[in-house]
Amino acid sequence: SFACLRHNCLLADSCPACRSPQRAVPASVALIPVPGLCAHKLIGCHGRGVTRCGTELAVAPSLPLAHDHPILKTQQMIDAAVFTGIARTGIYGRAPAPLSALIADLCALGGRIMRYPNLDELRQLTSDAVVAEFLAARKEATFGYRGVTADSSAVASGIAAAAAGSILGAANTAEAAGRMRWLIAFNRHNGRSVSATSIGWGRGISAALRSVQLSALSSYLSVSDQLRYRTHSTTPRRPHPRSAAERARWLPSLLWPAVCLNVRCDGVGFGQVRSALAVAVVLVGSRITLSAAAELLGAATSARAVSRVLQRVGRSDSATGVWRTVEELADLLDADRSPIDYARRRTLSCGGLLPESVWIEICLSSGISPGRALRLALARCWLYERITGSPGSRARWAMFMTGPTNRAV
């Protein structure tokens, strides 16, 4: 505890006379403590039979707080979790966490906040008076003879808990991530490493806090890493090592047109967008590289081409919606796979696809001219793309559709 909910104030943790923290060190075995009185030795006294301070601790001044102060709200959240053994509010609403996880989350966030304190942000989160009290305690810890340490005082614990509680008390992951971004930006501005692999800040933290951390870090990640960590989903998480190969089996090399119609990417053809987004679906939640993901889909594109398209989409206004759709599609394929095994279809030769006699019969029955060989090649390439999910340009008949002699069909 760092605050009193009955009197709406910060707890006092040091003697008003000798400034010694209470119960910081074990008392002498020869001493019988008197409740309510300071049991520390008077300054300058030595030995066992020395005079104790004996100051009445009830007269120690305490800092009053408004009834809705963030420090008191965080204390209420902790007390409720202690009473039930489970944290159910804020980011834990969708996935309740045990008390141990809540304490670990508070320690992880609070420790990082107080290790590199941004006083302007802390003043906004608490108040000028609370921060002034903390600065006074820190100054006394630095220059005082028997001063309390700033990081062990009630005011420091209250500030750390309030700052952490403002994040943990958010209604959802996105809101909590928005409240955490100042902390990540401040750390990076001061040269501290903050990455997806080093952002834990403590052991035993909850999955909910890890999701918030990854979501807050999203703008500092490359597009491929955003997909790997699912930063645009409701529950960002670490990549899984075995999710890519199975998912790629049920994906066409060119992502379904209906999924890609609303993607705006200037200077990039629709086929390139489809092939890049298919690779993006494979990347979601996996550690696979761009080149390996493209290979799983039949090498219809290259890692460099995919990277270029993803970067361009990432700079568009609709990027967040596109990545969210890609992540939702990946989750859908993991839960309920596609009815078509595209990995098997990619191995089909399709050598006897649409014989010329059948093509002529179709054209005559439809009242159109069969045209030259180019028209038949175009129809075969279109069928190849529809059946295999791979680009029609990879079909054996595509050679008839290229070259300077190519004319309108």
Q: How should each PLM-predicted stretch be described?
A:
Residues S1-V409:
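Basic, alpha-helical nucleic-acid-binding regions used in initiation and control of genome expression
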